[in-house]
Amino acid sequence: MLKIKPAAGKAIRDPLTMKLLASEGEEKPRNSFWIRRLAAGDVVEVGSTENTADDTDAAPKKRSKSK
């Protein structure tokens, strides 16, 4: 099972119920439909350390070389 929610600005329907995915997230089966939605960026996985901020533009910080 996956706990997923719509990505920011997206509205995604469950293909079985035809209802919109809840903005706070829902448990869905790990099947090809939801895996494709994850890969396309239409939904995001909600983990135990949920971060609601949009991290798409956050780049890893470069480490400075010490001399």
Swiss-Prot record:
Chief location of this protein within or outside the cell: virion
Gene Ontology CC entries for this record: host cell cytoplasm; virus tail
Location relative to the cell: Virion; Host cytoplasm
GO-annotated biological processes: viral tail assembly
Region described as Disordered: 45-67
Keyword terms, alphabetized: Host cytoplasm, Late protein, Viral release from host cell, Viral tail assembly, Viral tail protein, Virion
Induction summary: Expressed in the late phase of the viral replicative cycle. Expression of late genes is activated by the viral late transcription activator C.
Keyword Signal set for record: no
UniProt keyword Heme, yes or no: no
Residue ranges of coiled coil: none
UniProt-listed Pfam families: DUF2635 (PF10948)
Function noted in UniProt: May possibly stop tail sheath polymerization by capping the polymerizing tail sheath once it has reached its requisite length and prevent its depolymerization. Probably interacts with both the tube and sheath proteins.
The protein, known as: Putative sheath terminator protein
Organism taxonomic ancestry: Viruses, Duplodnaviria, Heunggongvirae, Uroviricota, Caudoviricetes
